[in-house]
Amino acid sequence: MMRRVYSPVFCSVAAARFAATSAAKKYDLFGYEVDTNTAPWIEKIKKCKYYDEAGEVLVNMNVSNCPPDIATYNATLQCIYQSPSKQSTPVDNESKFCAMMDLLEEMQHRNRLKPNEESWTWVMKECVKSGQFRLGYCIQQVMETECKGCPADLVKANEANAQKAKTEGKEHPGHLSQQAGLFDVKVE
């Protein structure tokens, strides 16, 4: 009789205790406890001078079973934007935009994190800074779709880059302007 009376009480207490401990700890696919303290890693990323070093910090995080969170990825995007180059000696054909897009892809497909407005803002800032207004238009569209808007100052700066390219005659890539137009070709 006593077992029937106390059984629901003990079961609910045990279930509440288990739920409290499992909510505080995260486990990976293989049952190992995952470290969720990303603050020291973010500090390491912020101290990196080149963005290749920040990538190494992300690798070390994964090795230490501490998967990056959205704040870590955003700190890495900021590092890519602010660093002068990938390495101490510039690499041929390096592209900060490509590095950022690669990181966003890793976020989404590997760690199943959706980039937020801050993530896309760093990419848009790089488009404006590098003068790549066409890519800026694309990122603006993505931000309007995903984040419901793009910062007005970045939109204005991107438009200024487009107008500057138009006045300099560089609105379209040079190799396209050298080709004959479809309607300019005379067929005999």
UniProtKB/Swiss-Prot annotation:
It is found in: Mitochondrion; Mitochondrion inner membrane. The keyword Transit peptide applies. GO terms for cellular component: mitochondrial inner membrane; proton-transporting ATP synthase complex. Keywords: ATP synthesis, CF(1), Hydrogen ion transport, Ion transport, Membrane, Mitochondrion, Mitochondrion inner membrane, Repeat, Transit peptide, Transport. It is a peripheral membrane protein. This is ATP synthase subunit p18, mitochondrial. The keyword Mitochondrion applies. Disruption phenotype: RNAi-mediated knockdown of the protein impairs assembly of the F(1) component and slows the proliferation rate of procyclic cells that are cultivated in vitro in the presence of glucose. RNAi-mediated knockdown of the protein also slows the proliferation rate of the bloodstream form of the parasite, despite the fact that the organism can profit from blood glucose as source of energy. Mitochondrial membrane potential is dramatically reduced in the bloodstream form that relies on ATP hydrolysis to maintain mitochondrial membrane potential. Mitochondrial membrane ATP synthase (F(1)F(o) ATP synthase) produces ATP from ADP in the presence of a proton gradient across the membrane which is generated by electron transport complexes of the respiratory chain. F-type ATPases consist of two structural domains, F(1) - containing the extramembraneous catalytic core, and F(o) - containing the membrane proton channel, linked together by a central stalk and a peripheral stalk. During catalysis, ATP synthesis in the catalytic domain of F(1) is coupled via a rotary mechanism of the central stalk subunits to proton translocation. Its main location: mitochondrion. PPR repeats lie at residues 36-70, 75-109, 116-146. It comes from the Eukaryota. InterPro entries: TPR-like_helical_dom_sf.
